[in-house]
Each structure stands twice: as structure tokens, then as C-alpha cells.
């Protein structure tokens, strides 16, 4: 058999040869073609929707919005996440193929926002449900900030190795797709001392400790398994 002669690289051919690794080639192809899943629940999604217009044109970053989680590799949670919506969000994330990424957009998604103080149905941070790669604060963040978050995610993907793509099993997560909620009753029963309620006006200065009689058979109102 004739021996195979490899061409000698000279100055005329060195510019047409690309030296890379399979890992870098895979990272480059993924960061240049992110397919986000449209998941908006509040006003933050209005800012994300403005990226589709000609002013910002997020198509130049290779973003192709998808409506199916099985065709997406990026989910951008924009808006408030409630307890009732949490199992659906986890189910969508689990249906996305690996490798997959998450951008938490807005204060309501990251910490619960203004609804986290007195709302019983708001999740205080989406990272309690699914792992988050990039946090994007704001109320709501501007479209320029969304582009900056996508750029940071692209830089993270470019530095990934194969072991980084294998997501560890979620530990200490609050919800799963088959999670059952059990609400513990509040220790504050609201029972008042009838004698104090019908006391004359001269006894208006009553200490707070003696006005309410609370029973505390259980701990404070919380969600338990």
C-alpha cells in the first residue's frame, strides 16, 4: 500500500487550520445557540419580551425562544413564583435535556420581592426549587441587564468542562413533582379575654401581655413534609 503523506504546514496554510479540543468546540456551539424557555409570570417578562424587537434584537446572540421544555436548554424565570406554581416549574426544569441553565430575573424571583414579607403563598427564592446559574436583580431589570446576564452565562459556558455539565442531585430542595403540602396551624388563635373587652373606659391602659391569650401547641406557621 502506498504510504500516506501528510501535507507540510507552511505560511500559506496556517491561517486555515483551527487547533481546538472537542470540549471547547462543544462549548462554543452551545453558547452560540441558547434556546430559552418562555416562562414569565409577572412584569419582569414584559422587559424580556422587549428583547424580541428590533432595538435589542436578541437573535444576534443565537437565542431561539421555545415553548416546549424538551427543546430548550435555558429557562429564564421572570416574575413571582408561588407555592401553587412551584411543582409545575420543577416539572418543566426536569423535562429539559442536559446541559441546562437557569437565569433568575427580578427581585421577586430571587428573594420573593415585596411579596415575601406578608404573603403565605410566595416562594422566597427560586433557588430553593431549581439550581440557578445567573442572578439578575432589579424590579424589573432593564433589557440591557438581561443581555448582560446572557453574556455572563455565555462566558460561564465557555469555561465549562465535562464534569461541570453533570448536575449533582438536588439536595435539600423544598419541592418535587410529587410533593405533598401539609400546612401547620397558626399558634395565634385570636382568643381575647372577654373581661378586658367589656371593661370600662377607665381601664384603657392595659399591657399587651394581658390583653391577648394565645395558645402555642405547635410552632409558627410553616410548611413541613
From Swiss-Prot:
Keyword Plastid: yes
GO cellular component: chloroplast thylakoid membrane; respiratory chain complex I
Database matches in InterPro entries: NADH_UbQ_OxRdtase-like_20kDa, NADH_UQ_OxRdtase_20Kd_su
Subcellular location: Plastid, Chloroplast thylakoid membrane
Catalytic activity reported: a plastoquinone + NADH + (n+1) H(+)(in) = a plastoquinol + NAD(+) + n H(+)(out); a plastoquinone + NADPH + (n+1) H(+)(in) = a plastoquinol + NADP(+) + n H(+)(out)
GO molecular function term, any single one: quinone binding
Pfam family, one: Oxidored_q6
Cofactor: [4Fe-4S] cluster
Mode of membrane association: Peripheral membrane protein
Family matches, as SUPFAM superfamilies: HydA/Nqo6-like
Keywords of the record: 4Fe-4S, Chloroplast, Iron, Iron-sulfur, Membrane, Metal-binding, NAD, NADP, Plastid, Plastoquinone, Quinone, Thylakoid, Translocase, Transport
Binding-site residues for [4Fe-4S] cluster, renumbered to this chain: 43-44, 108, 139
EC number: 7.1.1.-
Primary location group: plastid
Cofactor binding note of this UniProt entry: Binds 1 [4Fe-4S] cluster.
GO biological process: aerobic respiration; electron transport coupled proton transport; photosynthesis, light reaction
Subunit composition and interactions: NDH is composed of at least 16 different subunits, 5 of which are encoded in the nucleus.
UniProt-listed NCBIfam families: nuoB_fam, PRK06411.1
Family: Belongs to the complex I 20 kDa subunit family.
UniProt cross-references to HAMAP family, sorted A to Z: NDH1_NuoB
Functional note: NDH shuttles electrons from NAD(P)H:plastoquinone, via FMN and iron-sulfur (Fe-S) centers, to quinones in the photosynthetic chain and possibly in a chloroplast respiratory chain. The immediate electron acceptor for the enzyme in this species is believed to be plastoquinone. Couples the redox reaction to proton translocation, and thus conserves the redox energy in a proton gradient.
Protein's name according to its UniProt entry: NAD(P)H-quinone oxidoreductase subunit K, chloroplastic
Source organism of this protein record: Barbarea verna (Land cress)
Gene of this entry: ndhK
Amino acid at each position: 500500500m502506498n504510504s500516506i503523506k501528510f501535507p507540510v504546514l507552511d505560511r500559506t496554510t496556517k491561517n486555515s487550520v483551527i487547533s481546538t479540543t472537542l470540549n471547547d468546540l462543544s462549548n462554543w456551539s452551545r453558547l452560540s445557540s441558547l434556546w430559552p424557555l418562555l416562562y414569565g409570570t409577572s412584569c419582569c417578562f414584559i422587559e424580556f419580551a422587549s428583547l424580541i424587537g428590533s432595538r435589542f434584537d436578541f437573535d444576534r446572540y443565537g437565542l431561539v425562544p421555545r415553548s416546549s421544555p424538551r427543546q430548550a436548554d435555558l429557562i429564564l424565570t421572570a416574575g413571582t413564583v408561588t407555592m401553587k406554581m412551584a411543582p409545575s416549574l420543577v416539572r418543566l426544569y426536569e423535562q429539559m435535556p442536559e446541559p441546562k441553565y437557569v437565569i433568575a430575573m427580578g427581585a421577586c424571583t430571587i428573594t420573593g420581592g415585596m411579596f415575601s414579607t406578608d404573603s403565605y403563598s410566595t416562594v422566597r427564592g427560586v433557588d430553593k426549587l431549581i439550581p440557578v446559574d445567573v442572578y439578575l436583580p432589579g424590579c424589573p431589570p432593564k433589557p440591557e441587564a438581561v443581555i448582560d446576564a446572557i453574556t455572563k452565562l455565555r462566558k460561564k459556558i465557555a469555561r465549562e468542562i465535562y464534569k461541570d455539565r453533570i448536575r449533582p442531585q438536588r439536595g435539600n430542595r423544598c419541592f418535587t413533582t410529587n410533593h405533598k403540602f401539609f400546612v401547620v396551624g397558626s399558634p395565634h388563635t385570636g382568643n381575647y379575654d372577654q373581661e378586658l373587652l367589656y371593661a370600662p373606659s377607665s381601664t384603657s391602659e392595659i399591657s399587651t401581655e394581658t390583653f391577648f391569650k394565645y395558645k402555642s401547641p405547635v410552632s409558627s406557621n410553616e410548611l413541613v413534609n
